[in-house]
Amino acid sequence: MTATASPSDTKGAAAPRISFVSLGCPKALVDSERILTHLRAEGYELSRRHDGADVVIVNTCGFLDSAKAESLQAIGEAMAENGRVIVTGCMGAQPEEIREKYPNLLAVTGPQAYESVVAAVHEAVPPAHDPFLDLIPPQGVKLTPRHYAYLKISEGCNNRCTFCIIPSLRGDLVSRPAGDVLREAEKLVKAGVKELLVVSQDTSAYGIDTRYATSPWRDREVRARFYDLASELGELGAWVRLHYVYPYPHVDEVIPLMAEGKILPYLDMPLQHASPSVLKRMRRPGNQERQLDRIRRWREICPELAIRSTFIVGFPGETEAEFEELLDWIREARLERVGCFEYEPVKGAPANDLGLLVPPEVKAERKRRFMEAQAGVSLKLQRAKVGKRLQVIIDEAGPGGARGRSKADAPEIDGSVHVASRRPLRPGDIVTVKIERADAYDLHGIAV
């Protein structure tokens, strides 16, 4: 995910100007929004171009080598076009690599270092704040369209997957108080947000670090617990979509909320693999037969449930037999939304010590076979929707029609619904669409 701050809502002539690039996952996007909100509250304006700014901030991603390369490229472009650059984010936790290539950066800070970023901006270009021109919207500065927003409920992660270095970059799990999360969500909904996308490194672990501590919300106390938070969010009148959910037993508790229509029947659950031996090397939950049984039970409770997952092929030591286990599992699981990545070594990850690297051409071939198998599953599931009427939230609209998403589709990572309509549609509208045609990943229909 790459996002650039838009200056469309800024005013004033003498205020210092900031250009901002946000790379990586939705959690990083929320970090970017917090930084921008703080700076806008101090009177800074946003510039669409690097060469029109007083300073450039690049929020980096350091999860994969390819993400690091993208971050370094973005830093290089900012240096070339402006020369006054502040770097933050996950890659900033390892500043030596950045400083070696770009020694003249103004500052390099790590993830979640909001105060350090703001301090670096102050040092580079002091604020010229005018409270009479302070028109910050109550929901803060957002890098997403106005009708949806990411809601981050915690930082860090307690898991120690061998392919991942996030805990070393962002630390252990730190959950936000439930009352704080709910107040932010309420503010977003009042500002016109129609869809809340709940994100963290491990959403289903929410509150474990606080022993499910309570905090005030409206006229009552609410526990910092996965089910309790999901239930309360479901009362705010917006679509609520759960991302990055581990397959813990207590996930079962939220499925009835989906069946009742309180939250979206959508579960983003990165499973990573299906072979018990590969999962053991990954240090991931390993009983996928039991997981199949749980998925069947979930679908009995909530037939509309859409499960999204991501998988890694070519993990060190992955044999053809282990890969075939994965193929068999996805054919049986019939997941609605699936992504697949070729394994990339990450500096500092324990998986690097496993040896037995899978050749690049084998990884590419396995990814092709995996996506081919999933496309067949997806096409059958999509065709079953032809003739049905689905609620669709509109993302883009024009004279030739509109594009939106069903309850089974998250922005940027899932499919779209292409909508023909006799009446004008606007982004953020939620309309009923009769599905007339289906592709492997997209649907086509008419607004009714």
UniProtKB/Swiss-Prot annotation:
Keywords: 4Fe-4S, Cytoplasm, Iron, Iron-sulfur, Metal-binding, S-adenosyl-L-methionine, Transferase. It holds the Pfam family UPF0004. [4Fe-4S] cluster 1 binds at residues 25, 61, 90. InterPro entries: Elp3/MiaA/NifB-like_rSAM, Methylthiotransferase, Methylthiotransferase_CS, Methylthiotransferase_N, Methylthiotransferase_N_sf, NA-bd_OB-fold, Ribosomal_uS12_MeSTrfase_RimO, rSAM. Signal peptide: none annotated. One of its GO terms (biological process) is tRNA modification. Residues 16-126 form the MTTase N-terminal domain. The gene is rimO. GO terms for cellular component: cytosol. Its cofactor is [4Fe-4S] cluster. The keyword Metal-binding applies. Catalyzes the methylthiolation of an aspartic acid residue of ribosomal protein uS12. Residues 143-380 form the Radical SAM core domain. [4Fe-4S] cluster 2 binds at residues 157, 161, 164. It is found in: Cytoplasm. Belongs to the methylthiotransferase family. RimO subfamily. PANTHER family: RIBOSOMAL PROTEIN S12 METHYLTHIOTRANSFERASE RIMO (PTHR43837), RIBOSOMAL PROTEIN US12 METHYLTHIOTRANSFERASE RIMO (PTHR43837:SF1). This is Ribosomal protein uS12 methylthiotransferase RimO. Residues 383-448 form the TRAM domain. PROSITE patterns: MTTASE_N, MTTASE_RADICAL, RADICAL_SAM, TRAM.
